């Protein structure tokens, strides 16, 4: 799984693996077998790679079954029909086998595109932001379906996305990209709880940023003292606090105190906009996300505690 912002090189990486772009430097290998380098390139059709495009790219003049069968040229007619039946059944689209793509919804077309890409049993399965064109409900349904299909397959899969939550849901290993380079690789929980820099931390959700200075291995902030091991005294740092790390408590004694600016129910969670006194006009503006319904009135005062595993300290960007 490879998340990253637009323009970081995600799609180009997929196209290089698939053989749709020429390498200018380096090489592409699979199990020590070189697919491409600067001197030679294996043709795309020889690589046993399937690429699921963001825009589905179904053939409008072919039926669903004909679209799925398109890449199965090395099979007999009976084998081809059996494989088409199998993959359409996997994605729940068997009853649409004789329809044309124009009569299908976006979610249905995506299922057909998934079936077509899976049909040849590729050794490498590439997916280019496959769910980005779908509404939230359909996106969640198809992500779940795709995850189960990919887990059961014998292919190695690489999915690129700009959605960090999708990367955490779909990926066993996640490689974060920025400006054409991989910044950090690891399982989702490692990237979420142990990001190597502020970019990775902020990629996996909103963060509150607090500037500070290290003293005796700690940073003193308006919301509490944060451990900052490995930094020299006087070092300028940025403290990043996830909204869910700010826990709202009724007891203000021995806790940081915040004034409620506004509160909003987001369904399964509530988002609170808070102001914490910091000696400046307006105070320090922070966001807290709490589970369930918690809607303190505007102007009320609440106490704050911190969940340390969702608080990170990095060298200030301008230092």
Regions found by a protein language model. Give the residues of each.
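The feature captures the beta-strand-to-loop junction immediately N-terminal to the Walker
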Residues: 3-5
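ABC ATPase nucleotide-binding domain helices that frame the ATP-binding cleft
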Residues: 11-14, 112
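Helix-to-loop junction immediately C-terminal to a conserved catalytic motif
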Residues: 18
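Conserved coupling/switch loops of ABC nucleotide-binding domains, chiefly the family-specific signature
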Residues: 24-27, 179
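Conserved ABC transporter NBD signature motif
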Residues: 26-37
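ABC ATPase nucleotide-binding domain
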Residues: 39, 46-51, 55
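ABC ATPase nucleotide-binding domains
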Residues: 48-50, 58-199
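Non-catalytic connector elements of ABC transporters
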Residues: 207-209, 216-319
């Amino acid at each position: 799984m490879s998340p990253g912002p637009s323009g970081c090189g995600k799609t180009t990486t997929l196209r290089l693996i698939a053989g749709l772009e020429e390498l200018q430097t380096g090489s592409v290998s699979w199990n020590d077998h070189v697919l491409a380098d600067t001197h030679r390139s294996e043709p795309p059709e020889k690589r046993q790679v399937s690429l699921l495009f963001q825009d589905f790219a179904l053939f409008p003049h072919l039926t669903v079954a004909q679209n799925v069968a398109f890449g199965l040229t090395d099979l007999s007619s009976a084998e081809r029909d059996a494989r088409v039946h199998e993959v359409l059944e996997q994605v729940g689209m068997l009853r649409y086998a004789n329809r044309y793509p124009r009569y299908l919804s976006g979610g249905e077309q995506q299922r057909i595109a998934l079936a077509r890409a899976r049909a040849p049993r590729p050794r490498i399965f590439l997916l280019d932001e496959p769910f980005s064109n779908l509404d939230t409900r359909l996106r969640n349904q198809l992500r779940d379906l795709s995850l189960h299909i990919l887990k059961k397959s014998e292919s190695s899969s690489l999915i690129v996305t700009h959605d960090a939550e999708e990367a955490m849901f779909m990926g066993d290993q996640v490689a974060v990209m920025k400006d054409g380079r991989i910044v950090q690789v690891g399982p989702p929980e490692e990237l979420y709880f142990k990001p190597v820099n502020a970019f990775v931390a902020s990629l996996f959700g909103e963060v509150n940023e607090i500037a500070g200075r290290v003293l005796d291995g700690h940073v003193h902030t308006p919301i509490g003292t944060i451990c900052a091991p490995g930094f020299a005294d006087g070092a300028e740092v940025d403290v990043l606090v996830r909204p869910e790390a700010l826990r709202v408590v009724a007891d203000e004694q021995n806790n940081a105190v915040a004034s409620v600016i506004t509160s909003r129910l987001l369904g399964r969670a509530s988002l609170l906009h808070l102001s914490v006194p910091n000696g400046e006009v307006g105070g320090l503006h922070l966001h807290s996300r709490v589970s369930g319904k918690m809607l303190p009135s505007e102007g009320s005062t609440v106490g704050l505690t911190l969940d340390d595993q969702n608080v990170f300290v990095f060298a200030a960007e301008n230092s």
